[in-house]
């Protein structure tokens, strides 16, 4: 019995020793990870400097710090669940998850943080020196919370759309007000952009009506908007048919110029009709871009789906940040959370650009193709999680490239072509 008690005591002592060693190793690993991230430029202080550059408004210093910490929490957790952001923030700061979660919650309830007012600086930051923009307008819904968010995003070349302006409203309030909300968001972007900027708006069938065409024309915007096959299209020879009947037998893209649509015969510059073999349904596109060919208009409209993929990155539980699983009762809180998500999205995109610049993207490809197979956002997500355990020579490559990316942004603003 005495021998057994001695063995148990010895075993218990070894277990405690192993537990202490494990905790010590975890703490050492966490400290190393934080140092690695800080070396690359993804610490709270560097993100705070980024926000000061991106959102040049009169916010309290502590508020900007809270925004930067919340952004850091999203970067680490890749989640928009409030308590998960808090845990990510706590890890990054070696703090208390409880207090960090409360800080995130207070930030989301801070009425002094108004995304609608911050859009002036944010849009100018994202757009940069561009003289021509391709933007997509779409609704995304959160049925459990009776919320619907209208988003106007910039279509880019890196595989994802960059958030510009958004507004969340009660879904139950949309009846009779939907067009008013859309007008407000479109006009908000219009008043921010320089007058010389050429904007082409892409939108699906939910936005295809003659009043929208006239509204965009009055603003001086171009558009490519899909509409239903049953809508009457009258050509220049005064022949009127439902749009679907104007399709060619081969389904190849066809453009009709100087046409009129609907029974009211509203004049628009052109209509493009196409039913490619890869399409489930035909596309009937109303457009003001009569300067383009039918195939060019079709390709431009095809880029609209970038906004759907960005929605998935934000909403999906398995492949994104899981916003659809986060219950938020107040529409203003959701808009603030989307603001934090936008900050994180841009930082991860820039990190992905740095990875490509350093030639590290080839390590992510499972084939030998030359073109990009992962969006810059997804590449950035991977590199952020890989940084803590990254080999020194690879870390130096990424750190150098990321520094170059940020310097170009600060000095020449050419990097804004990336985001």
Segments the model singles out, each with a brief description of its role:
Residues 89-103:
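Short, basic interhelical loop/turn and adjoining N-cap
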Residues 94-95, 143-146, 211:
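Short active-site-adjacent helix-start/loop capping segments
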Residues 2-79, 119-120, 131-133, 157-419:
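Single, function-defining residue in the core of a domain
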Residues 77-87:
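Short, charged amphipathic recognition helices of the HTH superfamily
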Residues 85-86, 152-153, 185-187:
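Short, well-ordered amphipathic alpha-helices
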Residues 71, 100-159, 163-165, 170:
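Active-site-proximal, Lys/Arg-enriched surface segment
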